[in-house]
Each structure stands twice: as C-alpha cells, then as structure tokens.
C-alpha cells in the first residue's frame, strides 16, 4: 500500500463518517496493510487485495469481549 492509497482511504473514512478524526498509518510489518485510528484510538487494519488486476481494500476490526462491558 503506498502513501497515495493511504491518503485516499483516509479521506474516504473521514468523509463517510463526517469527521476528521481518522488517521491511517502504514503497517511496518506488512506493506499491504495500514493501521486505522480514530482520534488516536487504534480501530483495526485495512488490507489491500490485488486479485486478477482488481484492487479492493478490506477493513478488519477486532472487538474484544472485555471491550463490550462498557457498551
């Protein structure tokens, strides 16, 4: 995932959720993913999937059972 893609996805998240709180950071361990933050809180990872020339991005968010206690 390159910096242009990260900027575009970051803008997409902020526009879709009507905020400026989203930030994407390149995942240092995997060049095909980026970390997604909302107001400095880690939300999950977004992965680039390039299959048969079609590019898609998949967002993965893990919710721990203990996180649901405050919901």
Residues of each region from the PLM?
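Terminal leader/tail segments of proteins
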Residues: 1-71
